[in-house]
C-alpha cells in the first residue's frame, strides 16, 4: 500500500543546508497502523508531508497504492488527498463558519462519498450527538478533536496521516480519544501512520518504528 525507497529531503537556510531524511526505506501494508517516533528534527512530520504530496523529496521514490506520488503533478496529488487520504494534526483546521455536522461532512462531500448511516455511527461513537448544530468554537478542545476524527474517517480513506493528533489534550483525554480513534480506523479498513512522542499512544498501533539521523533505526 505504501512503499518508500531511498528517500532524501533537505532544507536550505540562510547559510547552510540541513538534511532531514537521508536514504529512508519504509513499507506499510494495507489496513495496518504504525506509530512513527523519533527526536524532534528526525524527519517524522516531513515524511508525512512528503507522502501527502504537500512537499517534494530531493530524490527517492514514494509509491502509494502502486502510484508514484513523488512524480505526480499537483492536480493528481490533490485528487488523492481529497478522496484517499486524511490528515489529522494537532491543529484541527475546523471551519469556524460551518456547523459541527457540516465540518464532519466536508471532505466526504468533496469526493462525493456521503454515507448517512456511517455519519450517524461516527457521531454517536464519538460522543457528538446533540452537538451537530453548534459551531466548532463552541466546543471543548476534546470535542473539536472528535469532530476532526469524524471528518477524517467519513469518506473511508485508504490512509490516515496523523501528527500528534491528541497533542493538545490532557493525558486522560488523549488516551480516551486515541483508543477510540484507533478502533474506528480499524473498523473503517483504513491504515494509520501516526507521529507521536508518547509510548502510551504508540502502544495502540500494530507496529512502532523510530527515525534517527534520517533513516529507520528501529522497527517493532
Regions found by a protein language model. Name each.
Residues 2, 8-204, 208:
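ABC family nucleotide-binding domain
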Residues 208-220:
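H-loop (His-switch) and adjacent beta-strand-loop-beta switch element
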Amino acid at each position: 500500500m505504501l512503499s518508500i525507497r531511498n528517500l532524501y529531503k533537505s532544507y536550505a537556510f540562510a547559510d547552510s543546508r540541513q538534511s532531514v531524511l537521508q536514504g529512508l526505506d519504509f513499507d506499510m501494508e494495507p489496513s495496518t497502523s504504525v506509530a512513527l517516533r523519533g527526536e524532534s528534527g528526525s524527519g517524522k512530520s516531513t515524511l508525512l508531508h512528503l507522502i501527502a504530496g504537500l512537499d517534494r523529496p530531493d530524490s527517492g521514490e514514494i509509491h502509494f497504492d502502486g502510484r508514484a506520488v513523488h512524480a505526480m503533478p499537483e492536480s493528481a496529488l490533490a485528487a488523492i488527498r481529497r478522496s484517499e487520504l486524511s490528515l489529522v494534526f494537532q491543529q484541527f483546521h475546523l471551519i469556524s463558519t460551518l456547523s459541527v455536522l457540516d465540518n464532519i461532512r466536508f471532505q466526504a462531500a468533496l469526493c462525493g462519498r456521503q454515507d448517512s448511516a456511517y455519519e450517524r455511527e461516527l457521531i454517536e461513537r464519538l460522543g457528538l450527538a446533540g452537538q451537530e448544530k453548534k459551531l466548532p468554537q463552541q466546543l471543548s478542545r476534546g470535542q473539536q478533536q472528535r469532530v476532526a476524527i469524524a471528518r477524517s474517517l467519513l469518506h473511508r480513506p485508504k490512509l490516515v496521516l496523523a501528527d500528534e493528533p491528541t497533542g493538545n489534550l490532557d493525558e486522560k483525554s488523549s488516551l480516551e480519544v486515541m483508543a477510540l480513534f484507533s478502533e474506528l480506523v480499524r473498523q473503517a479498513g483504513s491504515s494509520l501512520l501516526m507521529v507521536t512522542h508518547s509510548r502510551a499512544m504508540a502502544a495502540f498501533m500494530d507496529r512502532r518504528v523510530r527515525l534517527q539521523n534520517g533513516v529507520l533505526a528501529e522497527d517493532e
